[in-house]
Regions:
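Single conserved hydrophobic/aromatic residue that forms the stacking wall/gate
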Residues: 1-11
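Short, thiol/selenol-centered motifs that function as redox-active sites or metal-ligating centers
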Residues: 10, 76, 140
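Conserved catalytic-core segment of NTP-binding enzymes
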Residues: 14-112
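Short, charged juxtamembrane terminal tails flanking transmembrane helices
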Residues: 77, 149-152
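Short boundary/hinge segments that flank catalytic cores
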Residues: 99-100, 121, 130
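C-terminal boundary of histidine-terminating zinc-finger modules
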Residues: 115-126
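Short, amphipathic alpha-helical "lid/cap" segments that border enzyme active or binding sites
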Residues: 125-137
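Short, hydrophobic alpha-helical segments
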Residues: 136-150
């Protein structure tokens, strides 16, 4: 017998009431959720709501990613915090979840997203490409651990 092939599907949903997430949880077996936020205080309200909902519905939370954590100046490599000091770390610590990545607001990434080209394919050695590759590898490991935990 051949090993069963695992398929991964990523569903991106905007913050809101949580109705979409609840519907998906009721209809699909969700292996894990990744909470993605920005450093803005208003976004953290949705993060907390999402964390509580996934905990209540027993959907494993793989971690938190902070998007647009800082602006990465292409000429100097200097980091600028566009949204001020982030409180994402405080929320992650309070609810006992790990921040898996702090992704920058990077001009090359934005340009390639607009063109529909993955930066990881175009410039795999770019700092941001490496961050996405590491995040993807980390998520796959966490998903495998969740699957192992659920089979025992």
């Amino acid at each position: 017998s051949s090993p069963r092939r695992q398929r991964q599907m990523c569903i991106r949903d905007s913050p809101g009431t949580g109705d979409v997430q609840l519907s998906l949880i009721q209809k699909l077996k969700i292996s894990g959720s990744l909470i993605v936020t920005t450093p803005q205080d208003i976004a953290l309200i949705d993060v907390i709501r999402g964390l509580k909902m996934f905990e209540k519905t027993k959907v494993p939370i793989l971690g938190i990613v902070e998007n647009m954590s800082y602006f990465l100046a292409p000429d100097t490599g200097k980091e600028y915090k566009l949204f001020g000091e982030s409180k994402t770390n405080e929320v992650a610590e309070k609810y006992d979840y790990e921040i898996l990545a702090n992704l920058p607001h990077d001009p090359l990434l934005l340009e390639q997203c607009e063109k529909g080209h993955p930066l990881t394919d175009l410039v795999p050695d770019h700092k941001v490409s490496q961050m996405f590759i590491e995040l993807a590898e980390n998520l796959l490991k966490r998903l495998k651990l969740e699957q192992l935990a659920n089979t025992n």
